[in-house]
UniProtKB/Swiss-Prot annotation:
Keywords: Repressor, Stress response, Transcription, Transcription regulation. The gene is hrcA. Belongs to the HrcA family. This is Heat-inducible transcription repressor HrcA. Transmembrane segments: none annotated.
Length: 352
């Protein structure tokens, strides 16, 4: 339901939410009238706050208390009232550039460092999903002989992450030179067939193009590649999470039971969390925000999740988000997530 507000109502709603974000205390009309230069009387502020309460944008936690924003109030605030703070974006980009030597590190290490930095800057929990190996394009395949019958299959993905598995050859080759030639032929064949494809495209391999003398290996290779594909198809989304201890510093999480439920979700039920941080396919690069009850999981309904995706080229490969109380400084957090997502996209895409 769209709520039409006058300019004055927007001013007072914005001031009330800003005050509550800063203090974590219910906001009295007197505080708005005296601390914000709105050029209105205390009576006008009081009456306007009452109207905002009747509209469902504010509420009183106790009869004698001031007012606090509802989830609907925060939604209006985020969609219509805030102005993102550009300085935090510049600071984040500068720190990301200074702190990390991207190409010299594995992607998971980079993501962990980025998550830690965002938690430090925001004071909240940072969530980053790792790229799904099943959907990533294969850059290079290498077959390496360990002995006459064991071969290590190494996949290098387009993000430069590596995956590996062992294959036991039924008919090993004792001659080292012949074994090396055989593996080189098989390696060249697989690279020609699979470079630029993903593991979900194994059916595209034309095994008839493999030289006849090496056809004896085709069934074993097919079985191994199917095994790799099945392994990753059953893997849940892997998360990098940082800042869990920061949760305890927020007054909203003073109840032990509430914290335990949220920690259980973050640590043990990540398969349920993954759909919430997946961006809208219609606007994958935009920052998206789930406020309070907009989160479908009960432990997160006292939280806001601000998230976006990072890409390899134009293709989303993972998500990055900041999770905190609904009383978060949105004007700082939104540009922080946007900057981090853009920077991860830049670094992942240039790992060629």
């Amino acid at each position: 339901m769209t709520i039409e507000l006058s300019d004055r109502q927007k001013q007072i709603l914005g001031a009330t939410i800003n005050h509550y974000i800063a203090t974590a205390e219910p906001v009295a009309s007197k505080a708005i009238a005296t601390e914000y230069n709105l050029n209105v009387s205390p009576a006008t502020v009081r009456n306007t706050m009452l109207l905002l309460e009747k509209s469902g944008l504010l509420y009183q936690p106790h009869t004698s208390a001031g007012r606090v924003p509802s989830d609907s109030g925060y939604r209006v605030y985020v969609d219509e009232l805030i102005q993102p703070i550009p300085d935090i974006a510049r600071k984040a980009e500068s720190l990301l550039s200074e702190r990390f030597i991207w190409r010299q590190q594995r992607l998971e290490v980079i993501l962990r460092q980025a998550a830690q930095l965002l938690s430090d800057l925001s004071g909240y929990i940072t969530l980053i999903t790792l790229p799904n190996a099943l959907e990533r394009q294969i850059r290079v395949i290498q077959l390496v002989a360990l002995d006459s019958q064991q071969v290590m299959v190494i996949l290098v993905l387009d993000t430069y992450e590596t995956q590996s598995a062992l294959i036991q050859l039924e008919q090993g080759e004792e001659d080292p030179e012949l074994r090396e030639r055989t593996l080189q032929v098989l390696t060249n064949f697989l690279n020609h067939q699979l470079q630029g494809r993903s593991l979900v495209e194994l059916s595209a391999i034309d095994w008839q193009k493999l030289d006849l003398e090496f056809q004896t290996y085709s069934q074993q290779l097919q079985a191994l590649l199917r095994q790799l594909r099945d392994r990753y198809s059953h893997q849940g989304t892997a998360f990098v999470i940082s800042g869990l201890a920061d949760l305890l510093q927020q007054p909203e999480f003073s109840q032990v039971e509430q914290v335990q439920m949220l920690l259980h979700l973050l640590e043990d039920q990540q398969d349920q969390l993954a759909p919430l941080i997946t961006t809208d396919s219609q606007a994958p690069s935009q920052v998206q925000i789930r406020i309070g009850s907009e989160n479908t999981l009960a432990p997160m309904q006292c939280c806001t999740l601000v998230y976006s995706c990072y890409c390899y080229g134009d293709s989303p490969v993972g998500s990055i988000g900041i999770l905190g109380p609904t009383r978060m400084p949105y004007a700082r957090i939104i540009p922080l997530v946007a900057t981090a997502a853009d920077y991860l996209t830049e670094q992942v895409s240039c790992r060629r």
